[in-house]
């Protein structure tokens, strides 16, 4: 089941639990706007290359639409649509005043030079600048993009609309980015994991963790969990996987990964097959890479007691059912990885106010938002006798539905 089908299925289950009117349900599912643009740029060798860019603006009942822009060769309309919809529910679960959006360009960023990436970003911004804005749609980094990408978007957008630092988040700090934003998603994963474990009388210290993915989210989650006393025993990335039952030295692994462009060859553990990582013996499994990695083919072999979805849609619905029967608790993506968009909100607020927060305030506010969101999800679980995923979806969908009705937008 692809990401769009799975997300729509979860939404429909939540709508049924909430008893939503069929017309309202239909209107909440249909995106506000779908944008598809051609982006043609001159390559460094003088040839022309064309790429297709997408932006799906799903819902704005609760505020400006919010979501990342990813550069990846497999970007397609269905994936962008699904991720935009997920952002709508995620911002509602976090209770920040945003709707959902997502964008992307079908390209392989590793095959493009820095100057080519800049030209591509600026052309894409030229095509969508009148459809995004501080109070309309606020992009952010995602897979294949970073703070530099946001700086280019800000600069290009400002040529048309005047200097507008709040038009994107995840910017460099020197251009109005927030302190703590780089680590925000990984730190949110830590806070969400702490909240879940505390419900069962446990803490981070002494728990065994396995993390799939060592990009921004996975590496920060690993560092922060290790600092909190957790034992990270196995990690993978696109280059390979490494395991040490006594716990990996995360600081050394970060250094090795930076110097060697991946964790392959790390001497502080034994190399293992990346495919076996998800089924390693552990207490907490954190998928922090691509979607759909936990499926009906490997769900029965998963030994973790808890799964924290740091990636978007890492667990297929079929696997969800299998794991539920096994008693595995899954903290869903729309709660577990909401730290990034929450601190993006803090950045947006700082830009609008023209007042910068210190990092301690950012992190303290993030802990408050994540912990409160977890408590709200648990309350929905009790009210509707459902699991954490449906608790999160019913919470998010209910908040968006109420805003839609209050604004008189229901069909």
From Swiss-Prot:
The active site is at residue 102. Its EC number is 1.4.1.3. This is Glutamate dehydrogenase. It comes from Zea mays. It catalyses: L-glutamate + NAD(+) + H2O = 2-oxoglutarate + NH4(+) + NADH + H(+); L-glutamate + NADP(+) + H2O = 2-oxoglutarate + NH4(+) + NADPH + H(+). InterPro entries: Aminoacid_DH-like_N_sf, Glu/Leu/Phe/Val/Trp_DH, Glu/Leu/Phe/Val/Trp_DH_C, Glu/Leu/Phe/Val/Trp_DH_dimer, Glu/Leu/Phe/Val_DH_AS, Glu_DH, NAD(P)-bd_dom_sf, NAD_bind_Glu_DH. The lineage of its organism: Eukaryota, Viridiplantae, Streptophyta, Embryophyta, Tracheophyta. The keyword DNA-binding does not apply. Belongs to the Glu/Leu/Phe/Val dehydrogenases family.
């Amino acid at each position: 089941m692809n990401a769009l089908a799975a997300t729509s299925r979860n939404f429909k289950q939540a709508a049924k639990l909430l008893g939503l009117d069929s017309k309202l349900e239909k209107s909440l599912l249909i995106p506000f706007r779908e944008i598809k643009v051609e982006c043609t740029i001159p390559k460094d060798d003088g040839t022309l290359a064309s790429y297709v860019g997408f932006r799906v603006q799903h819902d704005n009942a609760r505020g400006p639409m919010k979501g990342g822009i990813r550069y990846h060769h497999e970007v397609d309309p269905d994936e962008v649509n699904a991720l935009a919809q997920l952002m709508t529910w995620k911002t509602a679960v976090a209770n920040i005043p945003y709707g959902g959006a997502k964008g992307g360009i079908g390209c392989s960023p590793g095959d493009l030079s820095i100057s080519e990436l800049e030209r591509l970003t600026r052309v894409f911004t030229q095509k969508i600048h009148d459809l995004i804005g501080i109070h309309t749609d606020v992009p952010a980094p995602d897979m294949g993009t970073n703070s530099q990408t946001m700086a280019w978007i800000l600069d290009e957008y400002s040529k048309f609309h005047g200097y507008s630092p709040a038009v994107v988040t995840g910017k460099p700090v020197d251009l109005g980015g927030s302190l703590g934003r780089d680590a925000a998603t990984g730190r949110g994963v830590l806070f969400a994991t702490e909240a879940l474990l505390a419900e069962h009388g446990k803490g981070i210290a002494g728990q065994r963790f396995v993390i799939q993915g060592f990009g921004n989210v996975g590496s920060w989650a690993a560092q922060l969990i290790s600092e909190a006393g957790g034992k990270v025993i196995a990690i993978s990335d696109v280059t390979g996987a490494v395991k040490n039952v006594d716990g990996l030295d995360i600081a050394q692994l970060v250094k090795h990964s930076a110097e060697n462009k991946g964790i392959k060859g790390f001497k502080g553990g034994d190399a293992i097959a990346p495919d076996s990582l998800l089924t390693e013996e552990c207490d907490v499994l954190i998928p922090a890479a691509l979607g759909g990695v936990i499926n009906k083919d490997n769900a029965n072999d998963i030994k973790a007691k808890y799964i924290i979805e740091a990636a978007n849609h890492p667990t297929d619905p079929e696997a969800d059912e299998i794991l539920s029967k096994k008693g595995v608790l899954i903290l869903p993506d729309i709660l577990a990885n909401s730290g990034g968009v929450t601190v993006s909100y803090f950045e947006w607020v700082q830009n609008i106010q023209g007042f910068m927060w210190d990092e301690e305030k950012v992190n303290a506010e993030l802990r408050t938002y994540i912990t409160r969101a977890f408590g709200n999800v648990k309350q929905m679980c009790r009210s509707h006798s459902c699991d954490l995923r449906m608790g999160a979806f019913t919470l998010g969908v209910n908040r968006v539905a109420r805003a839609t009705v209050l604004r008189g937008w229901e069909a």
